[in-house]
């Protein structure tokens, strides 16, 4: 079975910025890939937090140029929240895939076994994250959109304009 693909339709400062299409490594990290896929479709309904288990309408709250763009906190919106389809947090599945360059999709965490819904897209090779963050996919279309998101980031991670996932799901 081919690996699933998902998309984000992005806005930057309220303006359409284009589509990011990602392939999820369900063959290597099935639990992590399924969590992200279901959070893109919103098919699991409402989570324990009382918020929909859905990336739609959530923001990239932390964008650091020449490093990464982080999002997926749909409960608090500031990097303190998020929730997986399995409950609050889940274990690191494996560290088979590496942070090899731009477009790598990886789980943000607060230490071992703390995966929820927050993720990041690398804009450079970030090999120091290997063995600490679970790589579970890659951008296959729209890396230019990721680069545009990177342009509104800062050293602190604060964005100069809101970066929002206006819509998301699986391409038909």
From Swiss-Prot:
Domain PPIase cyclophilin-type, residue spans: 7-170
Pfam families noted in UniProt: Pro_isomerase
Protein EC: 5.2.1.8
Induction entry: Not induced by infection with virulent or avirulent P.syringae. Not induced by phenylmethylsulfonyl fluoride (PMSF) and yeast elicitator (YE).
GO molecular function: cyclosporin A binding; peptidyl-prolyl cis-trans isomerase activity
Listed InterPro entries: Cyclophilin-like_dom_sf (IPR029000), Cyclophilin-type_PPIase (IPR024936), Cyclophilin-type_PPIase_CS (IPR020892), Cyclophilin-type_PPIase_dom (IPR002130)
Location of this chain's protein in the cell: Cytoplasm
Keywords: Chaperone, Cytoplasm, Isomerase, Rotamase
PROSITE patterns with a match to the protein in the record: CSA_PPIASE_1, CSA_PPIASE_2
A single cellular component GO annotation: cytoplasm
Catalytic activity: [protein]-peptidylproline (omega=180) = [protein]-peptidylproline (omega=0)
One of the GO biological process terms: protein folding
Cited SUPFAM superfamilies: Cyclophilin-like
Domain of life: Eukaryota
Family, similarity comment: Belongs to the cyclophilin-type PPIase family.
Biological function: PPIases accelerate the folding of proteins. It catalyzes the cis-trans isomerization of proline imidic peptide bonds in oligopeptides.
Protein name: Peptidyl-prolyl cis-trans isomerase 1
Organism this protein belongs to: Glycine max
Source taxonomy: Eukaryota, Viridiplantae, Streptophyta, Embryophyta, Tracheophyta
Gene coding for it: Cyp1
């Amino acid at each position: 079975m081919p690996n699933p693909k998902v998309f984000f339709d992005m806005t930057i400062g309220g303006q359409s910025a284009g589509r990011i299409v990602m392939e999820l490594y369900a063959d290597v990290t099935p639990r992590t890939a399924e969590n992200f896929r279901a959070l893109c479709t919103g098919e699991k309904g409402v989570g324990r937090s009382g918020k929909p288990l859905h990336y739609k309408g959530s923001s990239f709250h932390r964008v650091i140029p020449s490093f990464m763009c982080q999002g997926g906190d749909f409960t608090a919106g500031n990097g303190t929240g998020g929730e997986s389809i399995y409950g609050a947090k889940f274990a690191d599945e494996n560290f088979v895939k590496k942070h090899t360059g731009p477009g790598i999709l990886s789980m943000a965490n607060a230490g071992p076994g703390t995966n929820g819904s927050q993720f990041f897209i690398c804009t450079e090779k970030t090999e120091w994250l290997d063995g600490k963050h679970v790589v579970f996919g890659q951008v296959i279309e729209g890396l230019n959109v990721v680069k545009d998101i990177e342009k509104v980031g800062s050293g602190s991670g604060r964005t100069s304009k809101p970066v929002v996932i206006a819509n998301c799901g699986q391409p038909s």
